Amino acid sequence: MARAMSETAEPGARTGAADTTVAPTGASGGIIPAAAGTAGGAPAGTGSVEPSFRYDARLAADIERRWQRRWADEGTFNSPNPVGPLSTGFEKVAGREPFYIMDMFPYPSGSGLHVGHPLGYIGTDVFARYLRMSGRHVLHPFGYDSFGLPAEQYAINTGQHPRDTTNANIANMRRQLSRLGLGHDTRREIATTDVGYYRWTQWIFQQIFNSWYDPQAGRARPIAELIEEFAAGTRAPVAGPAGGNTAVSVDAVRAANPAGLAWTELDEVSRRKVVNAHRLAYISEQLVNWCPGLGTVLANEEVTADGRSDIGNYPVFRRPLKQWILRITAYAERLISDLDLVDWPDSIKQMQRNWISPSEGASVEFTVVAPGEEAGASDPSGSSTARRIEVYTTRPDTLAGATFLVLAPEHPLADALIADTWPADTPVSWRFPAGRPGGGTEPADTAGPEAGADPAWTPRAAVDAYREFAAHRSDRQRGEEVIDRTGVFTGSYVRNPVGGGVIPVFLADYVLLGYGTGAIMAVPAHDSRDFSFARAFDLPIPAVLEPDADWYAAHGVVPATPSAQWPEAFSGAGEYRPGPASAPVLVGLSKSEAIKATVHWLEEIGAGRSARSYRLRDWLFSRQRYWGEPFPIVFDVDGLPHAVPDELLPIELPEMTDFRPTAMAEDDASDPVPPLARVADWVTVTLDLGDGPKQYRRETNTMPQWAGSCWYYLRYLDPTNTERFVDPTVERYWMARPGAVPGDGGVDLYVGGVEHAVLHLLYARFWHKVLYDLGHVSTKEPFKRLFNQGYIQADAFTDARGMYVPAAEVTATPDGRFLFQGAPVNRRSGKMGKSLKNSVSPDEMYDRFGADTLRVYEMAMGPLDADRPWHTDDIVGSHRFLQRLWRTVVDETTGAAAVVDEPLDDEALRVLHRTILTVTAEYAGLRFNTAVARLIELTNFVSKSYGKSPTPRALAEPLTLMAAPLAPHIAEELWSRLGHEESVSTVAFPIGDPALAAESVRTIPVQVNGKVRFTIEVPDGSAEQTVRDLLAAHPEFARQTDGRTIKKIIVVPGRIVNIAISPA
C-alpha cells in the first residue's frame, strides 16, 4: 500500500533515510551546493534557508557542464559508419536498425539564436534520444548554411570579411546549441563555406553540367553518350521531336544548327553549341532585376511594387543577362509523381504540385512570312527551313480566333523578327510611341509617314524605345489587369496554321519571358488581356465560341452583335462556331473533343503537337556576388564553357579586401561586374584540357545559397572522405531500406519550417534525382518523412510611427497599457525574431533556469507542429516540475539518493505501466507536449504517495529513464546517483506491460426498488462519484428510470447500488 504524505511535511521534501542508496562519486563528484535566492529557491530576504542540494539554476549549470563534457569526451552520440574512418565501434551497433534524423540547418546569423530557433532542434533531439534508448542506431548530425547574400551583406554592413563574420557567427551559434545539450555527432559537423565541403558542391555541379535528360529513357545520362549518338547518326542534332529530345534549349539548338544539318556537316563550334543546349546546366539570357545603384541583380522579393530597390530605393531595370540555368523542368513529371513515395504533410505536397503546376495543351508553330508575302496564300505548315515561332496554348481549339501573336519584349527571336522598314499601311499606333520619338496620339487607323509619322522612326527604333519602357516595369506590374495595353509592332507577320491567314507579331510587356515559351497566340474574343490589347490597337476580334443567351443578356447586347462590339471577352463555355475551310470541324464537339481534334489535325499537317507545360521554370543559378561557391567552369576564346578537371577542384574563392558589388550610375546600361571579375590574376588561367595549354577565363558569377543546401544530408554521412562525396556503402546503409521497393528510402525524419516547403525541398529533390540517375545515390527521394515544426510567437510593440521597439524595454501599467520610454505603444503578437525586436535569448534562459528547463518548457508549450506563444513567466512551471523530479530521487539536504528497494503495490504498478505505455506512444508520435504532461502526472503521484519516505527504486528508475529524452542532463545525474555508471542514453527505454497497466474491475449489481435489474463494471477502489458517473452513463439506467422520478440513489462502494424511483 502506498504511503500517504504527512500533513505536516513539505511536499516532496527529502531529509534522508536509513535505507537510502548513496550515489557514487565518479560521475557526480564536484557538486556545487545551491545558493539561496537562485531560480526555484526561496527569494532572498525571506529568512528561508535553502537546502544545500536543491535543484536550481546554479546546480543545473554545474550538472549540465559536467555531463556535456563527459558526452564529448566519451563520444556518447557518435554514430559509427559501417566502413571508413568513422567506423570505429560499428560492431557494437551492427545489429541495430539505422535511423537518420536531420534538422534543416540554420544560417549563422550575426545576432545568434533566440528561443524560437531551437524548437525543432529540441524536438529532433528528444526523438533521437528516445530511439537510441529503444534500440535504434541513430544518426543525428548538424551543420551550417553559411554561404549567401545575408552573410555577405552582414559582412559589408560591419566592415569585415564574410569569412571572419561567418566563422564567428558559427562559433557563437555552436556555443549556444552546445549549452542546450543536443546529442549530435559533432564529428560530422559541416558548413557550406568549408573548402572541403564546397569542393564537392562544385563536383556535383559538374555532374549536372556533364549530363542531359533523355525523355525516352526517362532519366539523366552522361553527355558523352549523347555525343556518341550524334556521331553514330542515331540521334539528330536538331531541336524538338525530330531530335528525339524535348528537354533542350530549342532556340539555342536552332541558332547553332539553323539549317538542320547532320552532325558530320557541323563544324566543331556548332557541335559544341548543340551539345551545350542539351546540358542540364546551361547558359541562357534571362530577365533579371538589375539595380545599377547597388551593382547587383535583385530577387523579386527585393524589388518594391513601384520598381525600385528595397534597399536604397534605387531604380531597378528588367533586362536580359546571360545566366547559368539548371534544367529542373526536365524532371517536372517525376517531381510530381514521386511525391507518392514520401511521407510528407499533404499541404506541403500540394504546395509543390501547385508550384510545378502542369497543364495540358499543344505546341503550335507559326511560320514567319517573308516580306511581301503577307497577302499571299501558303501551305499553313510552312517549309522545314522557314523561321518558326513556337507557342504553347492550353486552348488549341480557339486557333481560328487568333488574330495576332505577342512575344515578350526580351524574347530571343524578337530581334530576328524586326523588319528594316514598316510594311505598307502600318497604323501609326502600332509604332510605339505612336510613330515618333517623344510620343504622340495619332489615330489608330492607317497612317504612313505622310500622315505625320517620323520617317526615321523605324521598327528597330520603335522596338528599342519600347524595350526601354518595359524595362522599368516589374513582372507584377506587367501582369496586372489594365485597360490600356502597350506594345509595338515588329514589322513581321506569321501565318496562322488554321485558315492560313497572316497575322501581325507584336512585342508587349503583358507577356512574360519566364512563362510558357514567352510567346502567345492572342485570341481576343475569349481572353480579357488579348481583348484589351486588340481594342487598343484596333485588331480583329473574331469569335470561335458562341456565348449563351444569359451572357448576352447580362452584358446588354443582342446575340447578333458582332464580337468586335462585345463589351468584354467571353471566357465561358459555349458552342463552337463554324471555322475556316482549312481547319478541323469543331461544331457540336465538347471542349475536350475539340482540343483533341485540333491537336490531331496540327500533327497531321506538321504544324504542332500535343504538349504539356508547367508553371515551374528552369532554375536561375548564378549570382553576381562574392560570397558563394565559385563555378568549376572556364570559357575558351569562343566563349564556350568547359568544366575544369576533377583534379583541379576545389576552385577556391580568391582573397579580396573589397568584395562589394560594383555600384554604377542609376541609368548605366552596362552589364553587372561581379566582384570576382576584378581579380584579374584569378580570372585568367592557363589550363591543359586535353589539347595543349591554352588560356581560359574563369566564370566570375557564384552559385546561389541554395547550392550547398541541396545535398548536405549526403555529406553528413561521410564528411571526412576526400576521395568521394559519399562512400556508396555508407550511403546505402543510412539512406536505403532493405526489403523496400527499389529506390525507396531517404532521410528517415527531416524537420524544419514550412517556409522551405517549395524551393529548398524542390531543388534538393532535383539534385538528388540527377545523382540517382547517374548511379551516385541509391534512393529516388532525399527525404522519406518531413515534419514541419511550428513557430514560437511573442508580443511585439510598435510606436506611433508604426516602428517596432525593443519588447524587452516595454513596461506594462496597472491599467493594461504599455509604455516604451514613457510613450504608449501598441501590442501585437508575431513570430519571434530580429525584425519584430521581440527576441528572447536562450542564454538568458540557461542562466536563469538551466537548459533542461528550457527544453521541457518548449516541448510542453503545445504540439510540435503548432505555433505557440512565448511567456517567460510560464517557464517557472517547467522548472518546478524538474525540481519535483529531482526530489523523487535526491535528498536535498545531503545530495544522496533517497530510494528504497521494495516492490510496488498494485496501484503504483498500474500508474507506472500506464505512464510507460502512454509516454512511449507519445514519444514515437512526436507528441512531446503530452509526454511531458504524463511525466508530470507520474512525478506528482510519486510525491503524493511517498512524501518524506524514500521512493521505490522500481518507480524512480523508469521515471528517470522516461524523462531522459526531454531533460537529459538531470536524468544523467539522477541515474548516476541511483548507482549506475553508464550514460542514461545507452540504457534501454522502459517497456510497459498492458496487463499491469489495466485497471482491475468489479461487477456491481444495481437494484431498482429492491430488485436487481442490471449490473455495472467499475474500477476496483472507485470513489462513490465515479460509480455514480458510470451508472448515469449506462444505457439500462436511462431505460429503467424513463418517465419516473428518482427519489434516491444509494451507493455502497464496491458492493451494490440501490435506486428508489416513483411508480410507473
UniProtKB/Swiss-Prot annotation:
| PANTHER family, per database record | LEUCINE--TRNA LIGASE, MITOCHONDRIAL, LEUCYL-TRNA SYNTHETASE
Please name one Pfam family that this protein belongs to: Anticodon_1
What UniProt keywords are attached to this protein's entry?
Aminoacyl-tRNA synthetase, ATP-binding, Cytoplasm, Ligase, Nucleotide-binding, Protein biosynthesis
> What domain of life is recorded for the organism?
Bacteria
Q: Which family does it belong to?
A: Belongs to the class-I aminoacyl-tRNA synthetase family.
Which residue ranges does the UniProt annotation give for the motif 'KMSKS' region? 831-835
Query: Among the entry's GO cellular component annotations, what is one?
Result: cytosol
| Chief site of localization | cytoplasm
What are the recorded GO MF terms, alphabetically? aminoacyl-tRNA deacylase activity; ATP binding; leucine-tRNA ligase activity
Note the InterPro entries from the entry.
Answer: Leu-tRNA-ligase, Leu_tRNA-synth_edit, M/V/L/I-tRNA-synth_anticd-bd, Methionyl/Leucyl_tRNA_Synth, Rossmann-like_a/b/a_fold, tRNAsynth_Ia_anticodon-bd, Val/Leu/Ile-tRNA-synth_edit
Q: Which GO terms describe its biological process?
A: leucyl-tRNA aminoacylation
Per UniProt, subcellular location reads as: Cytoplasm
Name of the protein this chain belongs to: Leucine--tRNA ligase
Note whether Transmembrane occurs among the keywords: no
Detail which positions bind ATP.
K834
